[in-house]
Every structure is written in structure tokens, then in C-alpha cells.
Amino acid sequence: VKMAVLTSSNDRKMAAVYRARPEVRTMFDRILTAEMFSRSKPAPDCFLLGMEVFDTTPDTTYVFEDSFNGLKAGMASEATVIGLATTNSREAVAPLCHCVLDDFTGFTYDKMLQVHK
């Protein structure tokens, strides 16, 4: 399973993340930053670019998001969107995604595949 971070943060902000958490670079196949796409979330550009990079389609792409703009961007990309109620409440996140998680405890690959649009 290929995984990427698709962030509205720029390279400079991500450099600070890498200094604080160097392991982040090795946890993902790609990290796509704001310099790589023209419009920020809630536009779907970052997710569409991610699909292009991995040569995949919305039907086989899962977006995990906690921000409102990220959730909107994921839905606009037509991927399956899993909302994380880590920053905002379940009630606020639920209308903007296909499934809501409080955290990743007990969430497996098989459970992810059971989430449908």
C-alpha cells in the first residue's frame, strides 16, 4: 500500500517538521507540499496530484483528513474520505466524509476497505 502526505504546508514549514521528527520522511512513499500544486485545500488539487503520482484513481484512493478544508478537498477529489475527529467533533466532521474515526485504534486495512462512498 502506497502512502503519501499531501499538505498545504510549504517546504520551509516541512523542514521544521523534519528537524523535529526526522522519521516522518521514511514513513511515507511521498510527501507532496504546497509548492507542487496550484490551489490549496479545499480545492482537490493536492489529492488529484497524489493520484497522478501513484497512478491510481478515486475508486482506489483513501483520504484521511482532520481539517474541514482537507475533508472538502478529499470529497471534491471523489476519493473515499475518512474523517478524523481529532481536531473537530464527530458531529462536525461526519457530514464531510464517508466515515469518522476518533483515532486509529483498532482500524485495520481490512476495515478501511469496508468503507464505501
Task: Report each predicted region and the residues it spans.
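Asp-based, Mg2+/Mn2+-dependent phosphohydrolase catalytic module
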Residues: 10-117
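Structural signal for alpha-helical transmembrane segments and their flanking helix-loop junctions
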Residues: 4, 8-9
